[in-house]
Amino acid sequence: MDMATKIAKKVSEKGGRTFFVGGYVRDELLKIETKDIDIEVHGIDVDCLVDILESLGNVQKIGASFGVFNLKGYDIDIAMPRKEISNGRGHRDFEIYVDPFIGYEQAAIRRDFTINSMMKDVLTGEIIDPFCGIEDLKNKKLKHINDISFCEDPLRVFRAAQFASRFKFEIDKGTIKLCSSMDVSSLAFERVFEELKKALLKSTEPSIFFTSLKEMKQLSFWFKEVEDLIGIEQSKIHHPEGDVFTHSMMVLDEAAKLKDEAENKSSFMLAALCHDFGKISTTKLRKGKLTAYGHEVESVNLAHEFLNRLTNKISLKKEVLNLVKLHMKPNQMYNTSKKKSMMKLWDDAIHPNDLILLAKADSLGRGIDKDYSEIEMALRASLKDYEELMKEPEVSGKDLIELGLKPGVQFSEYIKLGHKLHLSGLSKEDILKHISNNIKKNQDI
């Protein structure tokens, strides 16, 4: 017997009812597998619920003051019906009142969307659907429940865009209008970033997240750089799809098809979003042609500002900026550059595989029906050469000591020189000869 059923049976013995709620019911009806289980207990007081939970395991009071508990070792959140009344502008500025006898409709009214308001009795399977969530699921419609409660949490603007993106649902016009009126500036950046990540990693068309926010006029505060891409024209020869915003959204959707092949899905998808930010300031009409020379350099600067606004994860930012900086090179170099240059490219990339995938998404996201297989084959062959080269022995500190060099500042310089020569294809023996001659020359000076 699973834990939810055990809890529900004991609650029933005390005269209460236990329901699966929120995303669990929604995903079950959509036939989407979910690990997160949320249940809500009605008809018994908090002390009675705590007694029941303590009889079943180690109770973790993750929000005891507002009736939310957890049992150690189980992925299940146990909550009680509650009212949330805003007392400020922030995501957490609420007064919370637990009321286990509030009734099903009043308990559901505090939820954001109709598709998240359904309740399923754990024991009987009965679904209580006071706001027609099942109908909206069938019609692929995302609709808020209550104007007042919805506006109490500005994060719901981004949740609306995220759900629309993940499920390819149409957002109700009334919900769009309401979202357009909400102030999102006080939200904690971590919360906004979490919704962005869900859209990027759980959606097959993450562009819908941004086109939805565009329709709501809610790009400007958190996604200023994305908004600034709108209307930036491109060469119709190379980019028949339209402006830089359109291109970036197409690249993002192409990247979504490839993300499962990426070494780091998060940095890969963020790089796909940020890769052309630099075109905002570098796009110019030169001799009758639209160009954006050096946009990849400026893209790094703007992507850095963008990421700093949304996350403090240093390694993630480093990986994104590395991909953005190098994103042009694979398609520029694959059939024109010397092997040495290609080896340096792969060496400069933190995740060479992801760089190839980004170049592929960038190429395919141009509205041109183009087969990328030949280019990808050439790039992967070159990357394989690099990987084989990296298996060969390189110059170490021990080698330098054997050449008579004492540990110091020069050590790292000679290690770097050895690696550079290794990339050019020299054997370790030849590299050591080169370094030995270099050391002797410096000693003779």
Regions found by a protein language model. Give the residues of each.
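Catalytic cores of the polymerase beta-like nucleotidyltransferase superfamily
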Residues: M1-I445
